[in-house]
Structures are given as C-alpha cells and as structure tokens.
C-alpha cells in the first residue's frame, strides 16, 4: 500500500530531524548524554520464525511469506489482498499467509530485539473460495506474547471472521523485555478457505533480532549410553490435593523423599520424571506445579555432603495428544519450557508419552520443537510410544508431516525413543521394539529403551494369575497390581540384550513404591536388574551393528503389525516376551524415511536392507528360512535364550500359563540343560573355572485381590477398587505385609563332567532361597543343580 509506505518514510524523516536537533543541543550546552537507540520497522516476512504450523490437510505445505497460503504453495506470485473498511481491495507486498487450524501458530523470537510495537492488517485473503457459509470462516485470531493473549478478534467479532469481514487493523504495544510473539488463528467448522493473512505485519524494534537457526547444540547436561544407563522414576501429581494448595503426588511420595530412597550407587544413573496426571485442566496449573518442583529440585542439599546437589528432573510435557480435556500439559508452551531449561540445571530433559490413542495435528510439530529446545540447552527429548495406529510411522512422516523427522536428522544425539507396551489392540509389542532398534542403529535415535507397563494386564483382560477367561477392563486397579514381578525383569532383559539403555516402569506405585518406600517389585527385581546393567554395560551401537545382518524397511501397519513376527520369534501378536533370541530384536525402519538415507547410514556395515514385503519375507515360512540362513542356531529347546559374549540369557516366555520350559546350551565347553518355571530369568556366565549363575523368579501371591471370584464372570462383578484403595493396598498389604510366594524350583544339568561341581559364593535376600543342591551321577558323568528360591540369587558353580 503506497499510503502506508509514505507514512513510514515520514516517521523515519522526523526521527532523523529530532536526532540532529538533539546533537546540536548537546554541542551547544556541553552536556554529556548517551546515544539513543533508533527504532525501526522490521517486516515479519523478512525474519525467520521459530516455528510455523497450519491447518491444511497436506502437511508438506508450508506457511507462506508475502503470499497467501494456497497460491504460494502452488508457486503462484499472487500478492496478499484484503477487503478494506471502505469496500476497496488492497494488495500488500509484505505479510504472512497460513490456514487456520486448532490453532495454527506462527512463533517469533523477539528476545533482546527491543520490540515496542506490532502492526498488521488481519483477515481472510481474497484468494479464498467461500463456496458455502462454512468455508472461509475463522473463529478468531490472537496475538500472544510470552503466553498471554494481548489481542483477540473475538472481542470485536464474537461470531468469528468471514470472507466479507473487512481487514482488521491492529497496532499493539508490546511489553518491555518480551521474548516470544505468536500469531494464532483458530479454524471454524471447516478449514477449507480459511486463508488467514497477516498483511503488512511488522515490528517496531530498537535492537537486532536473533536468528532462531543460528545456534549449535549445547554440551549435554548428562551422558546417557550403554555405560551410563538411565532409570526413570515417575511421580504423578495429585490434582485434588493441588486444588487445596498442596503440591503433592499420588501415593504420598515427596520429591526429596523419593530421591533419598534411591540407593546411592544408582543415583548417578537415575532421574525423577514428573507427570501432570489429574492436575486441574486449565492454563497455568501444570507450569505452576512443575516450577514449584523444579525449585525444590534445584535447591536440594545432600544431607550426607551438606552440598547443593540438584535432583535431576525430566518433565512430562506432552501426553494424550495434549488434548485439553485429558491433560494439564496442554497449556505448557515451548516458551515456558525454554525458560525452565534456562533457569534450572536440574532439568535434564522433557518427556512425551502415550499419544497413539489420540494422535492430534500438532504431535509431530511439537515433538520437533521439544527436540530442538533440548538440543539447544543440552537436554534430551525422550519419547515413549507404541506403534498402534502407525504412530511411529506417523512420527517420521507417513502422513506427510516431516517436521519431526527433519529435526531428528539434525539433532538425533538429543533424542531417545522408548516403547510403551501398554495396549492390546493391533499387537504391536514386537514391531515397536523393532522400530526402536532400527531407528537407533541408523542414527535416528541416540539411545533407545522401554516403558514396561503393568497396565497391560488390564488392557488384555487378565485377572488372577494363570486363570482363564477374559474380564475386559472391568477391574483396572486390581489388574495392574497382578502382573508377576519377575516378568518386568524379563521385559527389561529384552532391552538390555539389544543395546537399549533407558528403563521406565508403570504402574509407579506397584513398580517403585509409595510413601517414599520401595515396593517389593523394585527391591527384588528392578533394583537388582539395573545394578547388573550398570556393572555390565549392554552392547554398544557399534557392537550391535557388527552382529546385525539384516534390517527391515517398510511399515508394519501394511504388513500385519504384530502378526508379522508370530511363529518367527513371538508366540502371539501381543506379547511382552519373545520365544527365541536367535535373531536378536530384528530391527526395522519405516518407509517414510528415504531409503537412500538409510543405506547411507548403513554403509560400511554388513547389514542388508530388505523390504518387509519382499518375496523372501512374504510368509512365515519364507521369513524363517531367510533369518535362519543369517543367524545360526546356538541352542535347542522350547525356551527363550540369547547368547552375548560368554553369557547366556535365558527365560521362560509363558507369562500367564503355568508351563515349565527347557533348553540345552553349550557353556564352558560343557553341555548344559536348563529347566525354568514361568516368571524366571537366568544369566549363566562362563568364568573358565566356574559358571556364575544369576537367577530371579520373584513373585508374590496376590490372590487376595481376587477373593470371592472363582471364574472370570465372577471377577468382573467384584466391587471395583478405587485408586486410593489401590494405593493404600500397596502400602498396607504389599509393602508392609508382603505375601511372598512359595519358593519355586529351577534345575541346571551339566553333562560330561568328571566330578561333582561345588556351589560357592551364594548371595541373595535372607530367607528367599535354599542353598542350591548338587546331585552327581558318576555313571552318566552328569550333575543336577537344584535351586529353590523366590527372588534374586547369585552363586558360582565351580566345575574345575
């Protein structure tokens, strides 16, 4: 617009004249003054934004500079145009074009630029096509500064904006020292024709604008690797207590109390993960609760050293699609997260989890921003997800949104991917783990791990251990308490064997404890397994690349999901356990990542990239033949086993059937045979003169939870246990009056040995085991070692 340009030039001329007069005045009077910063106008389209989202269905399109959205994306030179107050149509050389969304957001970093004003004409571009009254109609447009709305069209146009609404002139004062400005546009019933433009949009500023792309990743606040694994301990905010002014957690844990409970040898490898849970779903609540805890974490003084040693924190900032009806995390902005990273060294990273069941439009774009921020400040973006609905595939661009994939390609060293084996639908345990390992091996993730969730007992309709029948989701709080303890160790073993190094567990009350006291599951399984992980690092990425022979390329959603592996290395499509470790965790990458990029990352390795739907893999018979040629058979039997250097990792994979399993192995140049009951895992290590045994079969008896039910139908009709009742049960019945199960029997046979072996160095929790017995048969030259225990036991079998 010519008139607007003339006004701007006049302003600059007046400022120049005033500065000349000031210099003359100073010279005449001999006064000492400081130079005044001259304000200038800067068009938003001449700056790079922090991020920009839109509501168009084609997510590969981008927000436009100096053009309306649709013509600009069609490579047309169409100028921005608006209907003015007098009915005339004006064109603009400068401005921004987007499609309204829920909302569409364009974010600028204005920190340090001394911005004093924002000016623009807002409206729906004349290029829009309002073919009916639902199209080219926008609910509202907002200008937001540092999370606060400073302007909204809703005040002037409560029924929204239409194609016929004249351009809205905004000339706003910007608060001093503002850091972020966002332009948000909210779609009406449809997004068709919602061609929102910010015509002639400009800042009046005194300083320089920071280029948001002009930074390099900061030094990491902590290293996470196979040699420095990570245990995440979650604490869930208690919303009802928060409403009463109490910053509290469910289970009556406290931040400091929970941290003190962590053994000193585990502390360097542990973080506390905060979760908003049922905090009131309104603006400011999650931010207030989290910052209160960050302050407490930052100021923590170790009573043993009398030194300030901040408690390491990871914040859950995105869950359930961040839908406002589900989570208070909805109102956590990237600006707020950046502020927390800047203020608190205790903040180690941000966490996203469980979006597969409500995948919203901004999952990928938000994840990209979380990763960028984490890289900028030396933190980690940790994402726990399951491939239900193809969520892993979507994260990497299968639906056309490539923003997260592009961010990972730049900042993969700050990204950790984890599975979350909660859901039953589609059966995606094995496919999700395959994606985790494949993305890790191809440098689309820095590390990987798993969130092992006892809610799976609820999701799959199970009730009392080993009982038949499906009760659906009728007894949630009884069901998550019922998964056998040692099964969590088996699940963690699968991560360890395949190079993963990040561990998290749910339900937190059952897996970790309440009232700042350890649960039996944590004491007997998780703690002992994690100690082993620390002292015996899992395979590194280079080691895993050296032993991996094939990598699947394609999408599991198009290849049967979990059924792809049934009969190969799983028994059923949904299972937390594998039937064999012969092939390892077969890695995969989704086809939304360009094939040439994967091949480039695999160059120099022996790994062959093969399409999931290749004729060589077209059915289970072909798949077995293909992988059997690549990986030799190293043991026999109907039990899971995987060899790692001089160690055998073995477990019974029947997690809800009372069936023993058996396998034969070579160790220390001796033939051995192992028989394990369900929920038992074993590590046998060849130490030349001896074989070290680490065995865990810990399981408590929780039949009292199902008292009164003799079958599934009766179990459904039991009174539902409330959340509070379940947490009280954990403390009163599980922690304080533990009903440890009976000692169970495991048998190890050694063949072709000339004398009876001896048992030495027996360690375990007092009362949880009998000293292993040895029965030697000189005629068959074999020895049978019988172990009776319920828990963790460690001993040596001396054979020479």
Curated annotation (Swiss-Prot):
EC number in record: 3.2.1.102
InterPro entries: Galactose-bd-like_sf, GH98_C, GH98_central, Glyco_hyd_98_carb-bd, Lyase_8-like_C, NPCBM_sf
Family per similarity comment: Belongs to the glycosyl hydrolase 98 family.
Keyword entries, A-Z: Carbohydrate metabolism, Glycosidase, Hydrolase, Secreted, Signal
Enzyme class name: hydrolase
GO biological process, one term: carbohydrate metabolic process
Signal peptide range in chain numbering: 1-35
Organism, scientific name: Clostridium perfringens
Record SMART domains: NPCBM (SM00776)
Major localization class: secreted
Catalytic activity: Endohydrolysis of (1->4)-beta-D-galactosidic linkages in blood group A and B substances
Localization, UniProt: Secreted
Upper taxonomic lineage: Bacteria, Bacillati, Bacillota, Clostridia, Eubacteriales
An example Gene Ontology molecular-function term: blood-group-substance endo-1,4-beta-galactosidase activity
Protein's UniProt name: Blood-group-substance endo-1,4-beta-galactosidase
Gene name linked to the record: eabC
A Pfam family of this chain: NPCBM
GO annotations of cellular component type: extracellular region
SUPFAM superfamilies noted in UniProt: Galactose-binding domain-like (SSF49785)
Function: Endo-beta-galactosidase capable of releasing both the blood group A trisaccharide (A-Tri; GalNAcalpha1-->3(Fucalpha1-->2)Gal) and B trisaccharide (B-Tri; Galalpha1-->3(Fucalpha1-->2)Gal) glycotopes from blood group A- and B-containing glycoconjugates, respectively.
């Amino acid at each position: 617009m010519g008139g607007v340009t003339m006004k701007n030039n006049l302003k600059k001329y007046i400022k120049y004249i005033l500065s000349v007069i000031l210099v003359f005045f100073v010279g005449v009077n001999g006064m000492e003054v400081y130079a005044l910063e001259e304000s200038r106008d800067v068009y938003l389209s001449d700056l790079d934004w922090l991020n920009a989202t839109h509501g168009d269905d084609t997510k590969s399109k981008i927000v436009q500079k100096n053009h309306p959205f649709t013509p600009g994306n069609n490579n047309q030179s169409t100028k921005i145009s608006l209907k003015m107050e007098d009915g005339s149509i004006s064109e603009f050389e400068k401005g921004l074009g987007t499609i309204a969304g829920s909302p569409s957001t364009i974010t600028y970093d204005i920190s340090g630029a001394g911005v004093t004003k924002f000016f623009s004409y807002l409206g729906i571009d004349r290029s829009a096509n309002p073919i009916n009254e639902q199209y080219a109609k926008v609910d509202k447009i907002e200008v937001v500064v540092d999370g606060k709305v400073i302007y909204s069209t809703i005040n002037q146009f409560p029924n929204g904006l239409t194609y016929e609404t004249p351009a809205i002139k905004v000339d706003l004062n910007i608060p001093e020292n503002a850091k972020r400005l966002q332009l948000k546009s909210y779609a009406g019933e449809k997004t068709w024709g919602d061609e929102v433009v910010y015509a002639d949009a400009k800042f009046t500023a005194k300083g320089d604008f920071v280029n948001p792309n002009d930074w390099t990743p900061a030094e990491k606040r902590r290293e996470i690797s196979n040699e420095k694994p990570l245990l995440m301990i979650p604490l869930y905010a208690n919303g009802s207590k928060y409403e009463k002014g109490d910053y509290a957690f469910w289970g009556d844990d406290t931040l400091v109390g929970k941290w003190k409970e962590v053994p000193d040898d585990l502390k360097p490898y542990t973080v506390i993960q905060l979760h908003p849970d049922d905090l009131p779903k309104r603006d400011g609540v999650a931010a207030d609760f989290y910052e209160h805890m960050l302050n407490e974490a930052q100021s923590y003084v170790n009573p043993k050293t009398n030194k300030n040693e901040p408690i390491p924190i990871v914040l859950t900032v995105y869950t359930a699609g961040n839908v406002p009806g589900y989570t208070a995390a909805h109102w956590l902005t990237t600006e707020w997260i950046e502020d927390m990273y800047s203020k608190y060294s205790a903040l180690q990273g941000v966490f996203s989890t469980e979006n597969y069941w409500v995948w919203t439009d901004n999952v990928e774009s938000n994840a990209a921003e979380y990763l960028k921020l984490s890289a900028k400040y030396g933190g980690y973006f940790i994402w726990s997800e399951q491939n239900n609905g193809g969520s892993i595939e979507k994260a990497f661009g299968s639906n056309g949104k490539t923003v997260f994939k592009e961010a990972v390609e730049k900042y993969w060293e700050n990204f950790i991917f984890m599975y979350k084996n909660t859901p039953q639908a589609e059966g995606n345990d094995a496919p999700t783990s395959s994606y985790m390992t494949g993305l890790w091996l191809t440098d689309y993730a820095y590390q990987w791990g798993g969130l092992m969730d006892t809610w799976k007992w609820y999701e799959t309709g199970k009730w009392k251990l080993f009982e038949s029948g499906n009760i659906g989701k009728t007894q949630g709080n009884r069901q998550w308490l019922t998964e056998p303890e040692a099964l969590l160790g088996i699940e963690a073993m699968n991560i360890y064997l395949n190079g993963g190094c990040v561990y998290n567990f749910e339900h937190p009350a059952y897996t970790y404890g309440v009232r700042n006291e350890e649960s039996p599951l944590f004491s007997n399984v998780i703690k002992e397994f994690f100690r082993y992980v620390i002292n015996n690092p899992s395979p590194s990425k280079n080691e895993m690349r050296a032993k991996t022979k094939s990598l699947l390329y394609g999408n599991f959603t198009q290849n049967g999901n979990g059924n792809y592996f049934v009969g190969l290395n799983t028994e059923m499509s949904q299972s937390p356990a594998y039937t064999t470790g012969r092939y390892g965790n077969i890695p995969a990458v989704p086809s939304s990542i360009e094939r040439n990029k994967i091949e480039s990352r695999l160059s120099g390795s022996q790994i062959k990239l093969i399409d999931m739907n290749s004729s060589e893999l077209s059915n289970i018979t072909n798949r077995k033949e293909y992988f059997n040629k690549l990986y030799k058979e190293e043991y026999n039997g109907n039990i899971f086993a995987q060899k790692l250097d001089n160690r055998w990792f073995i477990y019974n994979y029947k997690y809800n059937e009372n069936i023993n399993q058996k396998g034969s192995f070579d160790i220390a140049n001796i033939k051995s045979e192992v028989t394990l009951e369900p929920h038992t895992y074993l590590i046998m290590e060849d130490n030349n003169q001896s074989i070290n045994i680490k065995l865990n079969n810990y399981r408590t008896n929780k039949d009292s939870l199902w008292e009164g039910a003799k079958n599934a139908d009766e179990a459904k009709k039991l009174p539902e246990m409330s959340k509070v009742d379940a947490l009280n049960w954990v403390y009163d019945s599980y922690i304080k009056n533990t009903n440890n199960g009976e000692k169970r029997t495991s048998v190890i046979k050694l063949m072709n040995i000339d004398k009876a072996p001896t048992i030495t160095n027996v360690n375990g929790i007092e009362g949880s085991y009998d000293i292993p017995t040895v029965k030697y048969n000189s005629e068959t030259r074999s020895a049978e070692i019988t172990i009776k225990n319920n828990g963790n036991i460690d001993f040596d079998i001396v054979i020479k």
